[in-house]
């Protein structure tokens, strides 16, 4: 049974390559996969196929968007699909294609899918060392503007099942302190002037391990820099 579905998935992929889905019953395939006890690898393969734009356009033209999306949600839940699987798959498929564009010191820097996944793994390994140091679950806080190192921490947490709490920069020091306490943040990553200012205003009564995402010279307390974190 699975080999038949595997064949049909291969036919869909070939149709995608040929840009012709006229003879492909996507809805029937999704419903069959949804109704049977299918291996996780096949579920992943189906979800891989479903991400192509030509598939979305085909479903939209058939006026079956709601049914399709409901099927996809069910398959995602059954497969336990997660951020790490998504990035890993994109790295395998798109390799050196650009995943992120970053402005760094006024210059455009690109990061490929393969490089991004490698960086996420490196960050995840560093985060796992925190888990080994304690017998209770850790909670990561992110007090930073949108920057690469912060993105890596966020993606690593989502990829490897670590609880992460983004903390808004537009709050007061009282708001920040409240979130740190009530979210039970155990490790806080700090970046940028605003993030640093908020931390300096609340750090005096916090026993939170703090890591600087970039420059740590202006931060108060015992701060681990990014390079030390990755060691």
Would you name each region that the model predicts?
Residues 8-33, 196-231:
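ANL superfamily adenylate-forming
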